[in-house]
């Protein structure tokens, strides 16, 4: 995992239901906690593009349901600014399941992946079909 510079707009708060866009068997996951997030007291934790978070599988195959997993945000609907000044927003929110070390659990990713997530997580960039 590489660090990212600058501020990032976090668009997925605690409890958000996020579609899982890989082929692990999970369809919908709920955000429980964001890893390595340091904020002010009593602020609701939120995740943005490229953040790793802990989630619970809400919909999916019977083997995956109600499991606690790690995931990385690859798309978010809330607009965020890149270093060159452009504003980026996707049509949907999406996440990919990973191991605690950052290895991708699936073998394919459906849809585009944000460049910020691909730069931070090389394993996600390796299996993504489109990087925006």
Swiss-Prot record:
Q: Which family does it belong to?
A: Belongs to the universal ribosomal protein uL14 family.
Self-association state and partner proteins as the record states = Part of the 50S ribosomal subunit. Forms a cluster with proteins L3 and L24e, part of which may contact the 16S rRNA in 2 intersubunit bridges.
**Name of the protein in question:** Large ribosomal subunit protein uL14
Report a single Gene Ontology molecular function: structural constituent of ribosome
What role does this protein play? Binds to 23S rRNA. Forms part of two intersubunit bridges in the 70S ribosome.
Write down any Gene Ontology CC term. cytosolic large ribosomal subunit
Keyword annotations for this protein, in alphabetical order, are: Ribonucleoprotein, Ribosomal protein, RNA-binding, rRNA-binding
Listed under GO biological process in this entry are:
translation
* Superkingdom to which the source organism belongs: Archaea
CDD domains, sorted: Ribosomal_uL14 (cd00337)
């Amino acid at each position: 995992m590489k660090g990212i510079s600058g501020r990032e707009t976090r668009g997925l708060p605690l409890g958000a239901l996020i579609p899982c866009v890989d082929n692990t068997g999970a369809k919908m996951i709920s955000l429980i906690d964001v890893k390595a997030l340091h904020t002010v007291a009593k602020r609701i934790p939120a995740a943005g593009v490229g953040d790793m978070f802990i989630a619970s599988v809400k919909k999916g195959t019977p083997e995956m349901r109600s499991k606690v997993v790690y995931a990385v945000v690859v798309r978010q609907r809330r607009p965020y600014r890149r270093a060159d000044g452009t504003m980026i927003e996707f049509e949907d929110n999406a996440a990919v399941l990973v191991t605690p070390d950052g290895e991708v659990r699936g073998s394919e990713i459906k849809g585009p992946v944000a460049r910020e997530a691909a730069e931070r997580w090389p394993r996600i960039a390796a299996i993504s079909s489109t990087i925006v």
